[in-house]
């Protein structure tokens, strides 16, 4: 798998340290509350699992799955619901946990959908953000790392369902996906 990477962008240690910092900030921001953290499947799973263990609060968890990529490297802009939440978020403080925001289509769709369900508040926490590819206005509340326009894999991020299990985040060689 590592042969398919141009280079490691973020090491396991860098990710771990930043996740701890995000958890401390979220703990302070929600002191005295019981927020519900929503994991966007599948890519956010490792980040979500590590993040919630750093949040020192009573915390509820739920999961949602949407997609705008399929096996492509760029968002199609069309978002498809795959799995909805199991529980109501009405009147609850919601933290949406995402792996990466680039075009913003997926999160914009989700934000509108979730706000229509009348939560007390809704904030977005993303591990990675690439502002240069943003096609819709969207400002996450918590950002792990801002990165340039790379096709990244690892730590939950995939290409065609592969590379999610890498403990680091790496830049995928264009030769791996350019002829697909």
Go through each PLM region and give its residues:
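PRPP-associated nucleotide enzymes
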Residues: 1-180
